[in-house]
């Protein structure tokens, strides 16, 4: 009885893996901008084309984990409790929103989704992150940014990954945090 060599299968698998990972190096979710470059973002205009309108950008980042390309980004879904055109969550893998907003100067409440997708087609989102009554000044640029941490919870064999997201809103030019205002009792509100 003659045994078949597994070498051709290993070589083929290695070539396919290289092709898949190499071909996905430019991965980004839907048509959203993958790399942080605010000058290339076109803000969704809610200011009636005011020349001194504040602009709010939502963070976006691409990276690799274990060789798999990921795209994590924030997408604005509501301004002042009004759903933005085309925004929302249709399913766990289908989230839409705006990456930049042009607002009228003054106080506004924002709501957004933190979205994480990868080139393998898996991912998810945590929506209804919210900041209320934030003062946006004329002519200023802001960024809604995030930090996330992950942990594995559960008994062996029944583990699940838990993701914690912390968002801030900063003046993009001075780096001053404008929300939450620390020590004031304000918090970013995760809604359910």
Task: For each feature predicted by the language model, list its residue ranges.
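Sec-dependent bacterial lipoprotein signal peptides
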Residues: 1-24
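Short loop/turn and low-complexity linker motifs enriched in small/turn-promoting residues
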Residues: 24-192
């Amino acid at each position: 009885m003659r045994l078949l060599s597994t070498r051709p299968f290993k070589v083929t698998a290695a070539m396919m893996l290289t092709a898949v990972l190499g071909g996905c190096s430019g991965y980004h979710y839907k048509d959203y901008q993958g790399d942080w470059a605010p000058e290339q973002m076109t803000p969704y205009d809610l200011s009636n084309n005011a020349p001194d309108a504040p602009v709010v950008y939502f963070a976006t980042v691409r990276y690799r984990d274990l060789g798999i390309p990921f795209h994590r980004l924030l997408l604005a879904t509501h301004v002042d409790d009004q759903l933005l055109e085309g925004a929302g969550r249709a399913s766990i893998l289908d989230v839409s929103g705006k990456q930049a907003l042009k607002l009228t100067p003054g106080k506004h409440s924002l709501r957004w989704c933190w979205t994480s997708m990868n080139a393998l087609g898996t991912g998810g989102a945590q929506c209804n992150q919210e900041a209320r009554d934030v003062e946006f000044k004329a002519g200023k640029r802001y960024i809604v940014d995030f930090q996330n941490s992950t942990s594995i919870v559960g008994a062996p064999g029944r583990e699940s990954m838990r993701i914690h997201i912390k968002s801030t809103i900063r003046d993009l030019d001075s780096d001053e945090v404008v929300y939450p205002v620390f020590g004031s009792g304000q918090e970013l509100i995760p809604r359910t």
